[in-house]
Amino acid sequence: LKGFSELRVPDGEEREYDLFIAVDCAALDRLGKAQPAFEKAGKTLCIDHHVSNKGYALTNIIDGDASSACEVICRLLDMEKVSRDAASALYMGIAHDTGVFQYSCTSPETMRLAAALMEKQIPYTEILEETFYKKTYLQNQVMGKALLESMRLLNGKCVVSVMRQKDMDFFGVTTTDLDGIVSQMRLTRGVEVAIFLYETN
């Protein structure tokens, strides 16, 4: 996505910002290294869709019925003024949080907003292929291990798998490479609940 290379990870700097906008973050402690900057900011805004969000910012825009934070953002914008690059980013956010429009959080409004973004001539097929479906060889290997070592419980209605740190070290992957494993487990016929646990430092 355009602008991705300009993103910076907070490095503990003491800089104070006039405004801090937290997006898709349900709780203050989920901001990680950015939390000190949030607490020092002159004004704070939170845009989110998690029902667990209690509203930790000075101004909060939270819609627990929305499919994603990007859907909430779309409702705040004049869609006619949204650029193609911005539309691409918003579409990707909605697509990922809805599991490419298959999760129960997907509503008719979600689809209407996605359609409006598509009308901006965004490369929606490429976005989904490159950011949702395509995986590296190592990511496929570690998914294979998780599926191979999974087990079914409760008469096959629940499937569980575990990934240990030593396994991730063996494959040379991090927790970010584990995306999609629990979704793949959930697709098993007869399964109603999928649980994927992984060890962290």
Region locations from a protein language model:
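N-terminal small/polar loop signature for handling phosphorylated ligands or for N-terminal nucleophile
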Residues: 1-40
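Short glycine-rich anion-binding loops that position phosphate/pyrophosphate groups of nucleotides
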Residues: 13, 25-28, 50-52, 165-166, ...
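Short, well-ordered alpha-helix to beta-strand connector turns
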Residues: 4, 17, 41-42, 56-59, ...
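Solvent-exposed alpha-helices and their adjacent loops that cap or buttress functional pockets
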Residues: 12-15, 36-39, 53-54, 82-84, ...
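Short alpha-helices
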Residues: 47-113
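Hydrophobic/aromatic beta-strand patches that form the interior of the parallel beta-sheet core
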Residues: 8, 21, 43-47, 59-62, ...
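Hydrophobic helix-and-loop "lid/oligomerization" segment in the mid-to-C-terminal part
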Residues: 1, 16-19, 99-201
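A glycine- and small-aliphatic-rich helix-loop capping segment at beta-alpha/alpha-beta transitions
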Residues: 3-6, 36-44, 64, 79, ...
